[in-house]
Amino acid sequence: QIYITNNTLDREKGILKDLLKRDDVAGMIVEGTKSGLPNPNLELYRHLMMRKIPLLFFNTYYPELEVPHVSLNDADTAYKAVRYLIEKVHQNIGAVLKLDDGQGRQRYLGYLRAMEEAGLTVTDSRLVWIDTDESKQLAYCRDRLLNRVEECTALLAYNDQIAFQLIRMLEER
């Protein structure tokens, strides 16, 4: 069975409580909800673990839980992307990253490493942190976003959905 949290903690909590009432849960493959923030549902995961229900996290995980996880190396991927932009002679490189997912933090670390190695300045004004709701409709924060990246010659986007929206906004401008 597949459950979808839509990256909301309340939905995750409801799903976990429902699963704890069942006796037929053989295991779970989980993509963490708002994994870049403290999670109030960790105790529910601990109850599942006490019941010996196997958990495997993918893409991201909660460091407070000792569970196996499979993830991309988001820091290295962002590092390589920013290095590519630097090799193309960009110096004013900004980033649009998600603040509520663990991947956003990891991608930021890769961005920082590439910029620092190249001796380029990391400026807060070139960074835009968005949450899950904003990522679905960047138009809601259009003015703030465009003002922050106005001086940038290149941007690291959190993912392809963000990149697509950014391209459309910049073309309309």
Question: What is the role of each PLM region?
Answer:
Residues 30-31:
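Core AdoMet radical
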Residues 2, 7, 13-27, 39-173:
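Bacterial carbohydrate/catabolite-sensing allosteric modules
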Residues 35-36:
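Active-site core of PLP-dependent enzymes with the aminotransferase class I/II
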